Amino acid sequence: GEIDWFFNPTEHTSHDNEWTWSLYRHIYWQPLARAYALTKDEKYTKEFLHEMTEWGRAWPVTPFMENEEDAAAKYKFPGHSWRTIETAMRIYTVWLPCMEAFRTSPVWDREGWVTFLTLLCDHADFLMTHYSNHKKSSNWLTMESGTLLECGILFPEIKSDWFMTGYRRVMQEVKYSFDNDGIHMERTPIYHMVAAGVYFQCYRLCKLNDIPVPPYMEPTLEKSAQFIMSLVKPDLSTPMIGDADRDDLTTRRCDTSLYEGMNLTFDPYDLNEMRAYFRTWYEETGREDFRFMATAGKQGTPPAQRNYKYIPAGIYVMRTGWGPEDSYFHVHGIQLERGEVSSHSHNDTGHVEIHAKGEDILTDSGRYIYNSSCWKDWRHYFLSAKAHNTLYVDDHEMGTVPGVTRTRGVRTYLHAFEENEQYQLIDISHNGYDFMDDPMFHRRRVVRLPDDVYVIEDRVTGICREDHDIRLYYNFAFGHLDGENGKFDYTSQKGRGYTMTVQADKKLDFEILEGSEDPIGGWISYGYAWRKPIPQLIAKHSGKAPIHFITVLAPAGIRAEAAINGDAATVTLADGKVLTLTENAVELH
């Protein structure tokens, strides 16, 4: 039957506009183009032309060009086709690749070309007069400007200002949107890759057409690829920092979202967009570490560097190596550039993720759903400290500044980032709870010791006048967790056993949730609109700060006994050595 271009199956469940917006991104035309390239069967061309024509009839641009606000008001649900993000995204990820795949088809006749080019002009002209310019999340303007530049380069016969407008915007934004470490201002892997992919596509198109680019463009974009590479875990997946999914270099497709997926670019050789991204960078630079990523470790050489500290972004990564049985942990205190909206950042400062011997142990819970749906309580949960491995206080949104909306003022101070023969250490503090009525301060140290023993120390201080709901949350990867009274046993997906002990210098209560809907707790989302139960441990204290926590995670049978004595926290190991953490020192002797 014919496609209903106004259909949304979530009307009576999540009531989520993202489903319809995904429909308007036309990503399902990519398989038609691939099938035609392989078979030259004209039924695929006919279907592409038919769907394009019918979509154009269903969604003319004129009402949105004349008065976007009034036109959009008619489609609060299920959403409309002419948001600038969809307008831009479908052109560079689908329409232009489909043009390349189908353009020699004898079925694509003059009428089809008139329809295609008319609609393409509608898109580019609409983007000329509708520029989000950081009023929305910055990935919107990335796609808008990239699409204008690509249309300007590929269609010089069409008299327009597309090229110069897109060119100016892209060359300015590629530096404005990425810091000197090559990290995108939204600080989350999939939106980073969206922006990096658009600008890399623009860079390559400029090079192929002898169009000058600024001297900072190529090194900035190469660093953006290095950043994603530095986050990759030993199992070749990426961490779910902020609104990110679990993307995997080893699978047929890297993205598991049911809809609202990554939508990076179109690659003719590989459905896994992340592998394709690194392969293209390998072709561009000849770097063997990019080849290592592009082939999921089968060829090339792993990166020479193991540990990475990104102070401006607030992301810190340590690992034992790049092999499948290596271990990895990261701590983050995401710092958004001043003025950047917080759309895709979570309330998770101090979050620690632990990946031991090639599998996740402590994990980020992912993103699951956006506020475009009616499931606001689920969105709030996945944004909150509860869905991360960090300190929770009174459900306060970290970094909230009174009178300022959609901006996170969290800043992290890095006290130490150190590796020696005895341990690896990441030590941070932050201002996330400063604007509470009774301000509180949080310092976290994460120490990795031999035998994959991890020590997490949390010091919570402040004026300490009021009682608070103070909690530590630990979200475990798929597996089994049980225990009580501060000692818990966890069995991982690979059947490995671990023991976690949690202590404090004040009374603690404990709770384990797994797949709970009331209260919401113990869930993970590897992709948008997808969730599964996981074990979640909560250590709770009701009362005043200060409070001093010490958490130890160790493989089963490995001795690691913790204690708190005054200012010092100690962990006694099997060989008799003692790790001592005081306010100003970390020592193992």
Where are these regions (language model features)?
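Aromatic-lined, polymer-binding surfaces characteristic
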Residues: 2-9, 15-232, 237
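Cytochrome P450 core scaffold surrounding the K-helix E-X-X-R motif
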Residues: 362-365, 369-373
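Structured loops at beta-to-helix junctions and adjacent beta-edge loops in soluble globular domains
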Residues: 1, 8-10, 130, 319-321, ...
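Short, surface-exposed beta-strand-loop junctions and turns on beta-sheet-rich folds
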Residues: 324, 337, 368-370, 434, ...
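Carbohydrate-active enzyme catalytic cores, enriched for enzymes
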Residues: 183-362, 417-421, 543, 548, ...
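A residue-level signal for conserved active-site and pocket-lining positions in enzyme catalytic cores
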Residues: 148, 228, 318, 458, ...
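CBM-like, beta-strand-rich accessory domains located in the C-terminal region of large
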Residues: 88, 244, 268, 275, ...
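Extracellular structured ligand-interaction cores
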Residues: 18, 23-25, 313-315, 349-351, ...
